[in-house]
Amino acid sequence: MISRIKSFKNALNYDKMNCIEIILRRNDLMSTSFENKATNRGVITFTISQDKIKPALDKAFNKIKKDLNAPGFRKGHMPRPVFNQKFGEEVLYEDALNIVLPEAYEAAVTELGLDVVAQPKIDVVSMEKGKEWTLSAEVVTKPEVKLGDYKNLVVEVDASKEVSDEDVDAKIERERQNLAELIIKDGEAAQGDTVVIDFVGSVDGVEFDGGKGDNFSLGLGSGQFIPGFEDQLVGAKAGDEVEVNVTFPESYQAEDLAGKAAKFMTTIHEVKTKEVPELDDELAKDIDEDVDTLEDLKVKYRKELEAAQETAYDDAVEGAAIELAVANAEIVDLPEEMIHEEVNRSVNEFMGNMQRQGISPEMYFQLTGTTQEDLHNQYSAEADKRVKTNLVIEAIAKAEGFEATDSEIEQEINDLATEYNMPADQVRSLLSADMLKHDIAMKKAVEVITSTASVK
């Protein structure tokens, strides 16, 4: 009986053996096996004992009991034996499996010492009354990382710690533009102006959903609308009616509009232009109440920019060193599922941010003229890079034997609480100890890479 595998990676040397099966038997009579199918891929087979199944069946029955009717019994009071006789216990199996499966699967993965990196594909092998259930799970495991050089790296960075007078002036000019006011313009609209418009769109004389707007503020040159729309409003004046003719992109989200010519009857209500304040001491006070003169503001901004440049320079060195460490490493057969999951995570995070701003996925794709596939492709390259980077940094942390102390975990919790302005106890409830330990070990690995790196 094997109770633990010390080196699972060596046991799954697919180059030497076509198929290896490892069997484990636990004290609770749960049996678990892993069959290697290919590099970083295999099938777990595991059983669920009756002492786990019976409570799950009870929970499944109690979940539906309140809705059950049977002659001679009040609604919700059907006895279990009557239910089993009338419907059969098997109708509870699916719900019971959903209850017991997560814990059983995690136990199997833990027993085998596998590092699973994607959602498994679960199949039922056997589910017989009164017997243990047998299930299989097709899994993808974390690939082996063969580290190259990651210490004393020499890197090149396209960054500087220097701050010029032009940098300071540019920052002040940005703030000056932010304080600009939109005023009514008595004349023709130009690029950079804002027009307030009504518009009605049609294709072949038929209006379409989402093609109408009233009192919409459109910045000319902002790229808010599909290509060609804004350019045709340059030169228009308040009171003008402009026929805007455009063609929807072939990749437009709304398939019924993609590639079609459209006409937008547009009414110009107002033309507005920016009026920027004078560059003087009064402007400086408006920008920052802690200064009295424009010169004071320049001194303050120089210090801020120097601090920011220092941080940007350090970040550039860190990024270049990590990139080189990743390039020096070899990742054995990176599973594509890891990339797909990272892409999906990024897309879901982005769309979640959009929805918090009141923009639905349908609205986003219609406004940008893109598709779900375009968005996935946009994040694909970055996802590939991020997954490889994380794998290499994890491997370095393991090679260096980095672990987190209790005091480091507590400090990390306090730092996060301060950063996100929430109680430390709330941080503890949101992040598990394992997550914190992992992040701290990763930070130590990054520190090893960057602290020993030098700039060419």
UniProtKB/Swiss-Prot annotation:
Keyword check for Chaperone: yes
Gene3D superfamilies assigned to the protein according to its UniProt record, in alphabetical order: 3.10.50.40, Trigger factor ribosome-binding domain, Trigger factor, C-terminal domain
UniProt source species: Streptococcus pyogenes serotype M12 (strain MGAS9429)
Record-annotated PPIase FKBP-type domain positions: 192-277
Annotated keywords: Cell cycle, Cell division, Chaperone, Cytoplasm, Isomerase, Rotamase
Presence of keyword Cell cycle: yes
EC number: 5.2.1.8
GO cellular component, one term: cytoplasm
Physiological role: Involved in protein export. Acts as a chaperone by maintaining the newly synthesized protein in an open conformation. Functions as a peptidyl-prolyl cis-trans isomerase.
Family label: Belongs to the FKBP-type PPIase family. Tig subfamily.
Protein name: Trigger factor
Catalytically driven reaction(s): [protein]-peptidylproline (omega=180) = [protein]-peptidylproline (omega=0)
